[in-house]
Each structure stands twice: as structure tokens, then as C-alpha cells.
């Protein structure tokens, strides 16, 4: 009986041992399989700070990528690329045309100064400036020339020599003479020629166009509306009109791309440009001239300011649909 119990105990313990070994074996295999799987997955992955995608061309903060074909492209929200090379080329060509007009008008203006034709020079003064005002988004790239042509007296720094349109403006309207304008006139022609020659070297981008259009409206809000731009001649409405024309030209060039992305924005901008132009037309004298800015009432000035501000808000959205 004792031998039987001892054999049973041994067999029982052996059975328990086998069960334990089988369980441990299964657990070990599972653990080993999990470990192998983990290591395999880890081996197939690279650290997060080492991207696996091919290195792309440098991208600027504004989303613009240089391309291999030399054209400008903007990455849109839906991850497609918008080619703006045709638009930037068209805008640059238009500005080059404006520079031709600017030089021609400036030469006529200076010829009147040299001939002592005061009233004729005063009449041409605002018209001669308009091509420059339309083209400021590109003209301002050349920071040394812009102030030489367009600096206001209020913007002069200590010891700075004043030249350009506004220096001549002050003499014509405060001294009522052309005397003292000869050197200023010759310098103005030289500066305009230099600007005209430099325009073809300018790098024109979609961002410059969009930001330039908005800046033209901001300029109206900050200097034209207040009457600070043409403080002596009171010809601010000519500059006002030229700035609107410059911004509208950019909008027109970009319209096909905008139409494909946001047709409602095109409709809104078209209407709001028309509102501003209609308001300006109410202050027109004859076909090409405008009344002196100081003849506008406070309500008329306010109406212009509000129309420009309402135009500026959707105009700034052009960049959103192109990037």
C-alpha cells in the first residue's frame, strides 16, 4: 500500500511538472514571438527625427517653392501646385510699360519747369506721378530709388537731401514759381531712368503681387485719406485713383486663378472695386482731372475711407486661395 502511494505521488508530481513545463514553454514561445515582432517592427522603422521621404527643394515660410523648371509655384491647401509664372510675367511686363509712361511724362513735366511754364507744370504734375503710384509694389523693391523719387518732407531724416516730385511740388505751390527746380528736375529724370532700367531685374512673385495690392490700399488709408501725400498741391485724389488702378490690375491678372478657387471672392472684389471707382468718379472734373482734396467734405472723405477699408478685407484673401 505504501509503495502504491509513493508511486502515485511520484506520478502525480511528474504530471504537475510536465504541465508546468508545457505552460512555460507556450508562454516562452509567445513571449519570444512578441519580442521578435517588436524587434522586427522597430527594425523597419526609422527614428522620428530622420524623415524617410526624399529631400524636397527649399521651402520658404510663405509656402513658395522654387521649381526645377524655373517657374514659380505655390502649394495650395489641397496639396496641389499653382503655377503663377504667367501671371507674374504679365504683371512685370505691365509695370515695365508704366515705367515707359512715367519717364515720358516726367520728361514733359521737367521741360515745362525749364521753360518757366508754371500753370502747365502744375497741371501735369499729378498725371506724371500716376504711373509711379500704380507701380509701387515693384518700385519699392529698390529702396534707394523710391525715396529719391517720392519722399515727402515729413519723412526726411536729419541731414538727408530732399529730391523728387514732392520737393518740386513744394516750390511750385508754396513759392508759385518754377525757379529753383532745374537741378531737382534733372535729378528726377535721372532717377526715373535708373528705376526704369532696374525694373527688368526685379524678382516678381505671387506673394509680391498679393501683398503689393494690399499695400496700395493701406497707403491710401494711411497717407491719401489724411491728405499727407500731396500736402502742398492737394492732388491726393490722383494718387488715390492710381493706387486703386494698381491694385485692380493685380486682381485682374490673378482673376482666372481666383475664379477656379473661389468664384464668390471674385464677385465680391469686382463689386467693391466698382464702389470705390464710382465714389472717385463723383469727384472728377472733366475726363481726367479731380477736384482739390481739401474741397471734399468730412462725409465724403469718410465714405472713401470706408469703401477702401471694405475693399481691403477681401483683397487680402487673394493670398489664401493661392497658397
PLM-predicted stretches and their roles:
Residues 44-53:
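Bacterial lipoprotein signal-peptidase II cleavage site
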Residues 1-20:
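Short, Lys/Arg-enriched N-terminal segments with co-localized hydrophobic residues
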Residues 9, 51, 158-162:
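Generic detector of bulky aromatic hydrophobic side chains
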Residues 22, 37-39, 51, 59, ...:
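Intrinsically disordered/low-complexity terminal segments and short unstructured peptides
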Residues 52-74:
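Post-signal peptide N-terminal segment of mature Sec-exported envelope proteins
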Residues 21-45:
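Gram-negative bacterial Sec-dependent N-terminal signal peptides
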Residues 67-323:
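Mature extracytoplasmic or organellar-lumen-exposed domains after removal of signal/transit peptides
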Residues 10, 19, 23, 30, ...:
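Intrinsic disorder/low-complexity segments enriched in polar/small residues
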